[in-house]
């Protein structure tokens, strides 16, 4: 039975999972790597840490499964999106640490671009807004702030890529510089209607075309790994950004289906089919996947802080020692207290898009303690999801019929407390699948589809299995009171923004 290996390169760790041809998991491995915070609002990774942990986990997973390179039909790659690496075109040496998607150092630059009235043009082409979140302004920062970088780029000596592209380059020994349409669509440089890099956007941000990778289908032959990495060459046949990969892993192939992934951040995608839908509620229009040269689009809401709120409880406050303690602790909170955490640690994402505000707690009393803080942290994820859910229902014309169930995945979905509270606040069922490694599964599926190991999308969708459906159990009065309190807290935080 052949294996398909998924590389899942995330914000805080790298993972590798071997899937059998029946979509069951044979083995997995994971390694965390350091985060670097050189200034307020700045987040960086060492590219060598990304590479080293990726290769180490691939080898570890293969060892656990007793698999050789010959046993693996294909590799699929999924990755933290928007994070930028720029490297020397010959040596492969990065010119700077990777600038992570959470990084806000280009906020002032983005504000200037908006003030010049450029956002409508950018949004019309990319489906995105002008925000530090996306890759384009990060690349511009590197070219302008690393000594000699712009001159080298203009001479064709530098390459740019999101993390998938960087890993593909390294895996193929520098032979392949390519990405897929989902990752390209997150750069601010890619026209999602034409399916190509856009010269007007490249000129706007000062990015030479020679730096850019080829854009391919999400399921395609991207290249082959060099033999010395895994004891033999393995073909690489699938790439998708992490949230799009999770959409595929959740089998959201039908327009109107919606999934929400809970990792470091929270990201909800609504499949809108072959037509890109323009949001009137500050959601993003993005490429869900591209198969056979045909793009499928999605509306996306991006939240910057979800699981990282729990990390803050553990690492910042010392309230818990392990993430699994959060739900039971929250269950002990004083119901008479209404404590709200607005976790804008790096600004606010959809649907507010404010890079300047920072997190705040509201409703603290003398009796507020660890249980109330845990409660507020978990509920903040649910409230933020509600904001995305409401925006999607407003933007999607068939909302009443289509977006009635939310498929969830990611580490936080292991918390029954959080998932039940999510169903309560959405007033809608929340479905948790049997296979919760949906991001890796999506990458594996794309690779296995190209390699002929996995079936066509509809047959794959028929194999999706439900683990548990969380049904709303909160009274309408309680739900409305809690949502109103959240809205007041958000307004209170936004009122602290004095602009640039």
Curated annotation (Swiss-Prot):
GO terms for biological process: glycerol catabolic process; glycerol metabolic process; glycerol-3-phosphate metabolic process. ADP binds at residues 11, 15, 264, 307, 411. Pfam families: FGGY_C, FGGY_N. Pathway: Polyol metabolism; glycerol degradation via glycerol kinase pathway; sn-glycerol 3-phosphate from glycerol: step 1/1. Inhibited by fructose 1,6-bisphosphate (FBP). CDD domains: FGGY_EcGK_like. Its EC number is 2.7.1.30. InterPro entries: ATPase_NBD, Carb_kinase_FGGY, Carb_kinase_FGGY_CS, FGGY_C, FGGY_N, Glycerol_kin. Glycerol binds at residues 81-82, 133, 242-243. ATP binds at residues 11-13, 264, 307, 311, 411. PROSITE patterns: FGGY_KINASES_1, FGGY_KINASES_2. Sn-glycerol 3-phosphate binds at residues 11, 81-82, 133, 242. The keyword Transferase applies. Keywords: ATP-binding, Glycerol metabolism, Kinase, Nucleotide-binding, Transferase. Disulfide bonds: none annotated. One of its GO terms (molecular function) is ATP binding. It catalyses: glycerol + ATP = sn-glycerol 3-phosphate + ADP + H(+). GO terms for cellular component: cytosol. Key enzyme in the regulation of glycerol uptake and metabolism. Catalyzes the phosphorylation of glycerol to yield sn-glycerol 3-phosphate. Belongs to the FGGY kinase family. NCBIfam families: glycerol_kin, PRK00047.1. This is Glycerol kinase. It comes from Rhodopseudomonas palustris (strain TIE-1). The gene is glpK.
